[in-house]
Amino acid sequence: MRSVSPQSTMARIPERRVRTLDFAQFRHGEPSGSRGFCRELVDCLSSVGFVKIRNHGISGQEIENVFVMSQLFFSLPQAAKGKAAHPPEANPHRGYSYVGQEKLSRVKDYEKGKREITDVYDIKHYPIDRDARQESYDQGAAVDNLYPNRWPDEQDIPGFRVLMETFYERCHEVHQDILRAIAIGFDLSPSFLTDLCCQNTSELRLNHYPSVHPSSLRKGAKRISEHTDFGTVTLLFQDSVGGLEIEDQNTPGTYFPVLSERKSDIIVNIGDCIQRWTNDKIHSTSHRVVLPEDTDALTKDRYSVAYFGKPSRSQLVGSLREFVKEGEKPKYNDISAWQYNQEKLVLTY
């Protein structure tokens, strides 16, 4: 994971186009078109770290239903959300986290060995914590017996559990297909990466960034500090409010916005584990959530849904020999995916 220079963390440039790919070319296209898609996908992820995909198999109505349910959940009284509360400590990483409970800024330079708590300018409207300005709900696979899910009461929000478990499985299918496409793009067996993720340990998250009035802001306010994701591939669904920015790979420390032309588009980004496996052939790109410059947007709530793909817990996440060229050295030592995730996770709570 690369460092973000303190002098340039607030540098911003106009929107640069993150390419949008048609996933139907991979799933339903001719073999030549499918392989071409895979190579283009790897090219996008290697150069930018992010890509948008459409025609991925999850319908617009399914996505809309999750956003509606997310708004209903976060509008519940605090006591109702608290019935599914995330514990004060990192584990189990399940349930509802209140505004400021998670502190992602603590791990933004983890691979550089910088693990101290960093101070960032944030929204003084919420004095709980200076690092994070969101509330969230996390769940894992229904079959994950190590970390069972924490659900709100059915009478408080009918249908929540069924809808969320179903959507999790839909995202899991897309995650597996993206891993296959990346493997093919590297001229490897389609199952090369999915075999490393056969235990379903991925997580689905609902995010709510409460509305903010301009009078409550100070210079440099952020909703979420710079960070990279822990796992393999992240699938992000976001509303029209905006605020997601990613680091320019050619100018470290400079960020540009990523907008969704359609709510049904999935924004895909690489996580740390694939960066480690590929020996930096693909980087996990630093990203953050800032407040939109549009004055009207400042008063709006922002919602997003993220699926964090992860390897099997026992799988090692050091550099794989398939990605270490002759004359190169492995950049990452072996460590289990579970231990790597835990070392970073415990810093965020």
UniProtKB/Swiss-Prot annotation:
InterPro entries: DIOX_N (IPR026992), IPNS-like_FE2OG_OXY (IPR044861), IPNS-like_sf (IPR027443), Iron_ascorbate_oxido_reductase (IPR050231), Oxoglu/Fe-dep_dioxygenase_dom (IPR005123)
Broad EC category: oxidoreductase
UniProt record, GO biological process: small molecule biosynthetic process
Cofactor(s) the record lists: Fe(2+)
Record note on cofactor: Binds 1 Fe(2+) ion per subunit.
UniProt-listed Enzyme Commission number(s): 1.14.11.-, 1.14.11.57
Pfam family, one: 2OG-FeII_Oxy
Residue ranges annotated for the Fe2OG dioxygenase domain, each copy included: 200-311
Binding-site list for 2-oxoglutarate: 302
Biological or metabolic pathway of the protein: Secondary metabolite biosynthesis
Keyword Oxidoreductase: yes
UniProt KW keywords: Dioxygenase, Iron, Metal-binding, Oxidoreductase
Catalytic activities: L-proline + 2-oxoglutarate + O2 = trans-4-hydroxy-L-proline + succinate + CO2; L-proline + 2-oxoglutarate + O2 = trans-3-hydroxy-L-proline + succinate + CO2; D-proline + 2-oxoglutarate + O2 = cis-4-hydroxy-D-proline + succinate + CO2
Superkingdom of the organism of origin: Eukaryota
Function: 2-oxoglutarate-Fe(II) type oxidoreductase; part of the gene cluster that mediates the biosynthesis of pyrrolopyrazines, secondary metabolites showing insecticidal activity. Within the pathway, ppzD converts L-proline into trans-4-hydroxy-L-proline as a major product, yielding a key precursor for peramine biosynthesis. PpzD is also able to convert L-proline into trans-3-hydroxy-L-proline.
The name this protein goes by in its record: 2-oxoglutarate-Fe(II) type oxidoreductase ppzD
Source organism (scientific name): Metarhizium majus (strain ARSEF 297)
